[in-house]
Amino acid sequence: DINGGGATLPQALYQTSGVL
């Protein structure tokens, strides 16, 4: 939930790709 996606998946993935 680094980018506020609220996902339980690897947060580093969202932080890198900027998804959600």
From Swiss-Prot:
Has hemorrhagic activity. The lineage of its organism: Eukaryota, Metazoa, Chordata, Craniata, Vertebrata. Expressed by the venom gland. Keywords: Hemorrhagic toxin, Hemostasis impairing toxin, Hydrolase, Secreted, Toxin. Its main location: secreted. Its EC number is 3.1.3.1. It is an enzyme of class 3 (hydrolase). The keyword Phosphoprotein does not apply. It comes from Deinagkistrodon acutus. The keyword Secreted applies. One of its GO terms (molecular function) is toxin activity. This is Alkaline phosphatase. It is found in: Secreted. It catalyses: a phosphate monoester + H2O = an alcohol + phosphate. GO terms for cellular component: extracellular region.
